[in-house]
Amino acid sequence: MTKDIMDAVFIKEMAKTTSNLYRLGWDERNGGNITYLLDEKEVVEYLDVKQIIRTIPMDFDGKKLAGKYFLVTGSGKYFKNVEEAPAVNLGVIQVSEDGKAVHLLWGYTDSGLPTSELPAHFMSHIARLSVDPENRVVMHCHATHLLAMTFTHELTEREFTRTLWQMCTECLVVFPEGVGIIPWLVPGTNEIGEATSEKMKENRLIVWPHHGIYGAGKSMDETFGLIETAEKAAEVYTIVMSQGGIKQAITDEQLKALGERFGVEAKAGYLIN
């Protein structure tokens, strides 16, 4: 007999994270989406994986993820409602063997669907798993100050990254590889998914200009913390600029010393020798 899925750690983690994202104002209305790669062992504790509720076609070749299980936020769902009604706003899905569809095993009880950004998420999972087999989470949100920076700051990866590194001491330690930036593209398309996943091969943070940010990590906490750290730096930058601009900041020599102390190396070419 399977356990009650409402007691599953992965459901509780997702509910808590979506609530925090809404509380912080990073996922207004139905903005934002999360996909959480699950281990089969943890899924079968709560679900009979042979009991398929319905099959949902995809306009994307997901064969590289065939057979894998994911907990996914629903299309058009409000993050503020997840904690009170997980079964309506979330779904546990399995990618079909041919990669052309997903099987719904639990959730979306109002006949809902997975997030419209599923192709971008799945492409990002494929990219991250190719360089980090332990990657489990892809998270998209509209982090306010990072979003604002895309209107006022130079949109080159090196300069954007350097500014974030210089605003908070912990930034270099948390994301030494920097942030990736794609052009503005229509959301919910394979095109934006392909652009994002290409950047995901080298970065865990991808900025969507005038829209939001994508983050990836080994756990829900790691991924949330990654975005949270970059957003804090962007907030500090916003405050600094409103106070008259930068008069002093963390120097490149100090950033190098920081990297040496914490065993991380800044992306090649981003610091001045």
From Swiss-Prot:
Q: Which reaction does it catalyse?
A: L-rhamnulose 1-phosphate = (S)-lactaldehyde + dihydroxyacetone phosphate
Pathway the protein takes part in: Carbohydrate degradation; L-rhamnose degradation; glycerone phosphate from L-rhamnose: step 3/3
Kindly state what the record says about how the cofactor is bound.
Binds 1 zinc ion per subunit.
**Keyword line:** Cytoplasm, Lyase, Metal-binding, Rhamnose metabolism, Zinc
Q: Gene Ontology cellular component?
A: cytosol
Cofactor(s) demanded? Zn(2+)
Chief localisation class = cytoplasm
Q: What class of enzyme is it?
A: lyase
What is the annotated localization of this protein? Answer: Cytoplasm
The Enzyme Commission number assigned here is 4.1.2.19
Quote the record's binding site residues for Zn(2+).
Answer: H140, H142, H211
Residues forming the catalytic site: E117
Q: Which GO terms describe its molecular function?
A: metal ion binding; rhamnulose-1-phosphate aldolase activity
TM segment ranges: none
**SUPFAM superfamilies linked to this entry:** AraD/HMP-PK domain-like
Gene Ontology biological-process annotations? pentose catabolic process; rhamnose catabolic process
Explain the purpose of this protein: Catalyzes the reversible cleavage of L-rhamnulose-1-phosphate to dihydroxyacetone phosphate (DHAP) and L-lactaldehyde.
Q: Which family does it belong to?
A: Belongs to the aldolase class II family. RhaD subfamily.
Under what name is this protein listed? Rhamnulose-1-phosphate aldolase
Organism equals Listeria monocytogenes serotype 4b (strain F2365)
